[in-house]
């Protein structure tokens, strides 16, 4: 038997075409009780709107530890003015740089959990401030183009302290958008593809390496990588891991939602499929120990083996050096998932933002496209990994079954593939 108590507070500031909106803060508290073993236990959850559990829901010693996370007071109210100032100043910068419009989402989240078993109790507290911007450019009556970026900081105070660099970041985004549009058609061919540090690389490795090595998938032999544990699938310099403790202080956690210590799990080590991410249930099924990846969307959901901070380990060089050897290729800056077959490894992604590469230099943007292939072939085609890693947050979270969205993050350097298939999309 165990008990899980959660407190979550969320505050949002948006800037849309209609103006700036400050959304009412959300504040949730609840508890979940598991009776029976993790492999087939019964979970019962209760929302605690008033912060005080009904008599008998929690043992007295658990209730005493839960008083702090269940307290009524807001933990985000002191950052309200800072969040509004960040949004206002970035909108002003985008306007000065010539953007048609800048959409901004600034969300700060504070989460406090307590996991208790008869033999021990552990607490974990996380906070992050997520900034997402989308710049628009185009002439009146003509086509419009956009570019999206995001960044995460541990809280609104440190986000606000980084305003000078954030203003430069938005200014660069808008100017690059203006200089690289209008777009040319996406190629229809197999060609070298590069991912700069950021969204495209994060999306690719999350789908192609992460989900196939979640413990429940591995336990049922349900993925192309699960069937290849211990086998080489990429070059020796390709290392991919998932480490909940490493997220630049923004999204990391010390204990998972089952009370197990979070730790780094090597998914690919030296190009070899190495380890799955495990919760208690999948670990038991595989005859292994949990490794700190049992995560809940919230107190209403039981834990599942999930990714946290998926990273490609840095190797050597940077984007410029990886580009230098490419005569004709595609620099893909932003992907979104389209299709992923865990059994076969076949995948396809929407190309949201990309630029043609000619003679080692990034050129004009291309129109919408589709990147497709097979996971084993794509991993084998990685011929360079840079040392220029950057952290990124999945702004829409990660969904699995009916459990989502769950906050996840990434650490990604530049990555080059000898060849991937691309074609125009819609």
Model-assigned labels for residue ranges:
Residues 1-426:
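N-terminal small-residue-enriched
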């Amino acid at each position: 038997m165990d008990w899980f108590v959660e407190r979550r507070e969320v505050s949002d500031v948006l800037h849309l075409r209609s103006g700036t909106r400050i959304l009412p803060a959300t504040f949730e508290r609840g508890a979940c009780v598991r009776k029976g073993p993790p492999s087939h236990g019964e979970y019962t959850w209760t929302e605690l709107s008033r912060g005080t559990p009904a008599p008998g829901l929690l043992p007295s010693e658990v209730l005493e530890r839960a008083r702090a996370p269940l307290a009524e007071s807001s933990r985000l109210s002191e950052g309200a003015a800072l969040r509004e100032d960040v949004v206002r100043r970035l909108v002003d910068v985008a306007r000065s740089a010539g953007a048609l419009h800048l959409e901004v989402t600034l969300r700060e989240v504070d989460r406090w959990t307590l996991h208790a078993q008869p033999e021990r109790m552990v607490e974990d507290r996380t906070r992050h401030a997520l900034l997402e911007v989308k710049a628009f450019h185009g002439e009146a009556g003509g086509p419009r183009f956009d570019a999206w970026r995001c960044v995460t900081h541990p809280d609104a105070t440190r986000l606000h302290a980084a305003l000078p660099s954030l203003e430069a970041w938005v200014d660069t985004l808008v100017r690059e958008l203006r200089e690289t549009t209008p777009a040319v058609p996406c190629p229809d061919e197999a060609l070298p593809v590069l991912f700069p540090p950021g969204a495209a690389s994060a999306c690719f490795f999350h789908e192609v390496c992460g989900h196939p090595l979640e413990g429940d998938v591995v336990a049922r032999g349900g993925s192309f990588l699960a069937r290849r544990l211990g086998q080489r699938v990429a070059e020796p310099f390709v290392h991919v891991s998932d480490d909940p403790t490493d997220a630049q202080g923004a999204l990391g956690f010390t204990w998972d939602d089952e009370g197990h210590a979070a730790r780094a799990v090597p998914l690919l080590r030296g190009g070899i499929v190495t380890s799955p991410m495990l919760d208690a249930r999948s670990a038991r099924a595989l005859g292994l120990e949990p490794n700190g990846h049992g995560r809940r969307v919230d107190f209403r959901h039981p834990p599942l083996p999930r990714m946290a901070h998926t990273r490609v380990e840095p190797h050597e060089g940077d984007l410029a050096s990886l580009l230098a050897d490419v005569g004709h290729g595609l620099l893909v800056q932003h992907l979104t998932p389209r299709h992923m077959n865990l059994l076969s490894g076949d995948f396809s992604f929407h190309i949201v933002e990309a630029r043609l590469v000619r003679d080692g230099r990034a050129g004009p943007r291309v129109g919408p496209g589709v990147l497709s292939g097979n996971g084993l072939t794509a991993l084998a085609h990685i011929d360079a990994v840079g040392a220029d890693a950057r952290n990124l947050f999945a702004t829409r979270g990660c969904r699995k079954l009916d459990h989502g969205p769950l906050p996840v993050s990434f650490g990604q350097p530049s990555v080059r593939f000898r060849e991937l298939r691309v074609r125009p999309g819609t």
